[in-house]
Amino acid sequence: HLTVFHRTANFSVPAQNEPLTEATLAHVKAHYAERRALGREAVTGVFLSANDKSALEVSDEDRLKEFEFRWRGAGGGFRMLRAFNDLLRNPIANQYAGDFVRGKIRATVKDPAKAEILCPKPDLPFGTKRLCVDTHYYETFNRDNVDLVDVKAHPITEITPTGLRTTQGHHELDVIVFATGFDAHQAERIEAFDARNLPQLGTHGIRQVGGQAGGHVGRHCAQ
């Protein structure tokens, strides 16, 4: 049995991970130069099939169709952020995206009370806090062996020898997993094969493609 003690809801979008077909691999490899060029011009630094239209210039039907395509058909993940060109610049466009995802949460989570706990509040604009990317995250809360506790409504008061107590009552637990996050920006001593560290490697300047990045986005850096 799993009990999730939930504080603040963030937006989560489906990863849509799937095996790459030979046709997909061939298409990507045939367009490496084009994808690199598009990535250099993208605000994210990577090619995410951006839509150049505003969310305000299309009909409600076309807007919903584009969001659905990003949610299920465009590879999922961060591609939701590129559904329209003004999601992170126009409050109304952003609200459309946020309302779409909240609608997906309410449609997926069968218990209305759980769904509302999992819905990000209106004071969190879509995409302004790093998106979570998941595989069946919201569906998990439909399982009989998964409970959800809102610790904003019922704060944790103490850890006991047998579990955890909130203002609502005591929860018997075998294991407590602390989801307190991690420090992604703390300096780390990274050495090259010849034992030189990063400051030494940058003595004569730094060369990169489009910018610098570290932490959890470091994998996107070009050498």
Question: Could you describe each region identified by the protein language model?
Answer:
Residues T3-Q223:
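N-terminal FAD-binding dinucleotide-binding subdomain shared by FAD-dependent oxidases/monooxygenases
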